[in-house]
Amino acid sequence: MKAVGLVVEYNPFHNGHRYHLAQAKRLTGADVVVAVMSGDFTQRGEPTILDKWSRTLAALQNGVDLVVELPVADAVQPAHRFAMGALSLLNDLQVADVVFGAEHPDWDFAAMVKAEQDFNQAAFHQFNNTYATQFNQQLEAVTGHALTDPNDILAFAYHRAKAAGDFGFHLQPIQRVDNHYADQQLTGAISSAGAIRQAVKGHQDVTETVPVQTASALAKLTTIPNWEQLYPLLANHLIQTPAPLLEQTYQVKEGLENRLKEAAERHRDFTSFLKAVKTKRYTYGRLMRVAFYLTLNLSDQDMANYHPYHRVLGFTAAGQAYLHQVKKELSYPLITKVNQRMKNAELALDYRAGKLYQFFGTPEQDLTRGPIRLV
């Protein structure tokens, strides 16, 4: 059986995603679709609007055959780490192709990756701008293109990861079909995930934009997960923890701990807290991830101890058959059910993330849950 791989968040699963996976299957002639999906928190460190099980079910009922969770240690990361983590899993699962949306699928991303060797490295030691801004200035000077759209950024990261990882699959970008990620207005049947989330918050009807499974799950929401709800946990942690201990948190370095601590003492809501910490050096995306690391109490040692694995969230009959085909050749552990030992060992970070997500009133995310089976 031939498999095509997708890297997804499905936040939530919508009609654009259904188009993407149908195109992926058509372009590659694959027998099965394998999706590596973020769990309950996105790449930016935000809680997903629906939990990973609801999103897995919608994916399986709309064309995906196997859903594997991207561990939180790789899921809540900048594009380069996110891409490497996801593609490592797909490569181990022996997919033949990885298909992804991009704003400019005609760009030669592989050539853009090679162009990095011509960058002026001295320019990156200036701290009056974020690394991303300085990187784009260099990239545009060398290639004529700047990475300003999120899917183009990921496309570049996928090509960089493939070059570094020597992966065996083929990368295939396709045209993104929904409205721009920053657009907050619905644009008919094909609308962005961001616009759909905003519409749900505003109590608008989104049934035209999502499959019936997603619409049903959204209709049952009693609260929309957001950082304002988690902020008391974050603020308390920052206020109660001495700065030297905060510095042991992953990605909290170079005085950022003092800035975070001071902001937590002064601000009572997450939005004003984030604005107080923001500088030209730190993007909002990075600060959102740092907020997640702090609330999860994710340390440098936690990250050093992390090793990849395949946590299966669900499969169809075809997905089950494919998993049986490849499982004996996997380099990473295959996990279908979480036990008491795992929650304190290899799955400790994902277990903690699931417990954090339960603050939104959701059921247990890990210990009592096995893969969803549509067989």
Curated annotation (Swiss-Prot):
Describe the function of this protein.
Catalyzes the formation of N(4)-acetylcytidine (ac(4)C) at the wobble position of elongator tRNA(Met), using acetate and ATP as substrates. First activates an acetate ion to form acetyladenylate (Ac-AMP) and then transfers the acetyl group to tRNA to form ac(4)C34.
The record's GO molecular-function terms, alphabetically, read: ATP binding; ligase activity, forming carbon-nitrogen bonds; tRNA binding
Main location group:
cytoplasm
User: What is the official name of this protein in its record?
Assistant: tRNA(Met) cytidine acetate ligase
Keyword Oxidoreductase included in the entry's annotation = no
Q: Spell out the InterPro entries in the cross-references.
A: Rossmann-like_a/b/a_fold, tRNA(Met)_cyd_acetate_ligase
Give binding positions for ATP: 7-20, 101, 151, 176
Q: Which domain of life is it from?
A: Bacteria
Q: What is its EC number?
A: 6.3.4.-
Q: Name its GO BP terms in alphabetical order.
A: tRNA modification
Pfam hit, one: HIGH_NTase1
Quickly give the catalysed reaction: cytidine(34) in elongator tRNA(Met) + acetate + ATP = N(4)-acetylcytidine(34) in elongator tRNA(Met) + AMP + diphosphate
Kindly list the places in or outside the cell where this protein is found, as annotated in its UniProt entry: Cytoplasm
* Organism of this sequence: Limosilactobacillus fermentum (strain NBRC 3956 / LMG 18251)
| Gene field | tmcAL
Extract one GO cellular component term from the record: cytoplasm
Name the UniProt key words of this record, in alphabetical order.
Answer: ATP-binding, Cytoplasm, Ligase, Nucleotide-binding, RNA-binding, tRNA processing, tRNA-binding
Provide the family line. Belongs to the TmcAL family.
Record bears the keyword Ribonucleoprotein: no
